[in-house]
C-alpha cells in the first residue's frame, strides 16, 4: 500500500530492453545456421555446435548510397568476398535493400565465429561501401 495515496494501482507497460536492436538479425542467424541459444551459457551455437556472433544494424545510411541498386550492392560484396557462406557459416546478410537506391539506407547483419570476426566483417562492409560510393564525388 502507498501511504500517500492509498492502495497501489498497477499499470502494465512495455519496456524494450533488447541490446541487439531488432529481432531480425537473431532470426536470420537462427535460420541460416539452424542453431539456437545454449540455455546454460547464453551463447548462440550453430546446428554444427560452433559458437556464432553477430553485429547488426537496421539503419546503415548515407547520401552516397542513393542510386546504388541492389544488384550493385551484391556485386560489391561478392567481389569483396563478404557474402554469407553456408560452408563457413560466416559472412554478411543484407535486408531492407528496397530502401537503398531511393533513400540510401539498408540493414546489415555480419555473422562470424568470434566477436572480432563479426566486427571485422561489419567494418569491411562499411569500408567497401565508402570506397565504392565515393568515386567521382567531391568531399562535402
Q: What spans do the regions from the language model cover?
A:
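ATP-dependent carboxylate activation and anion-phosphoryl transfer catalytic cores
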Residues: 1-140
